[in-house]
Amino acid sequence: MTSTLRVAFAGTPEFAQIALAAIHQAGFPVVAVLSQPDRPAGRGMQLQASPVTQYAVTHGFAPILQPPSLRRTGKYPQEAAEAIDALTAQRPDVMVVAAYGLILPQEVLDLPRFGCINIHASLLPRWRGAAPIHRAIEAGDAESGITLMQMDAGLDTGDMIAMERVPIGLTDTTGTLHDTLAALGGRMVVEALAKLAQDGKLHATPQPAEGITYAEKIAKDEAALDWSRHAAALLRQVHAFNPFPGASAALDGVAIKFWQAEVLADRPAEAEPGVVLAANAEGVTIACGAGALRVTQLQKPGGKRLPAREFLQGLAIQPGQRFASRG
């Protein structure tokens, strides 16, 4: 399809790039792209463009705007003013925002004729904030989803345009759920833009006043496991922190990351939390506050993710050894 609806896009990571690609492939003219500045990345810490910027460059979108801030009165007033002026010159009808990572001041929210539509990876108002996918898995939620929202000045508080639910499977990680939700978000925003182009408006309803929770940004130190917890809670951590930052625990001073695991209901009553109960081709089984965790994919510093059989060939682990516990 082709459309006269002039779409601006603001986003940074792969989640956003998938939405941008869906909008582009659906035939909507993308008249401006905003993304965060290039950042040092990789072992060489070379400057690297975001997935959104890379897609925009590859497909010839212009202008591509990468201000460090959009606040005229903030730390970077000149960069903010230049970006806002460039965006204004494109006369966007609507701006789609997905995991952009910068605060949009009211001036920017009001700039497009139809405002700004946000793609948020949760069932709002649950898990407003920066890490909704991680937090949903960590909390043991049965489902997640995508909410399209008409943005306002609050933190994910805008009226809801559309919502679709997705079950969270027993083996889902943040990585797998991210991919599912990213594809869903792309489809949903294309449908919303098509409706907006046809009707000239989108119906939106206020978020419920009850059930509000916040998804705080993930801190690296959260990934350290506390073996006094129930094995099921630790499994949720393993899933939630895959692929970032990786659930971990130290064994004799060596930090080991856990990428895949399963819960075993029984363990010897006398086993202290953190003690290795078994280490074989099936996995490394570790006593928890309740039950045990059998870790089936591990990684040592500087190494690759490996199934337990291969990992143990390079780092011997014996029953009776004890993993350090967080806290």
Swiss-Prot record:
Keyword Transferase recorded: yes
GO MF annotation, one: methionyl-tRNA formyltransferase activity
Keywords, ordered alphabetically: Protein biosynthesis, Transferase
Transmembrane segments: none
Task performed by this protein: Attaches a formyl group to the free amino group of methionyl-tRNA(fMet). The formyl group appears to play a dual role in the initiator identity of N-formylmethionyl-tRNA by promoting its recognition by IF2 and preventing the misappropriation of this tRNA by the elongation apparatus.
HAMAP family: Formyl_trans
Protein name: Methionyl-tRNA formyltransferase
Organism (species): Ralstonia pickettii (strain 12J)
Lineage of producing organism: Bacteria, Pseudomonadati, Pseudomonadota, Betaproteobacteria, Burkholderiales
Gene that produces this protein: fmt
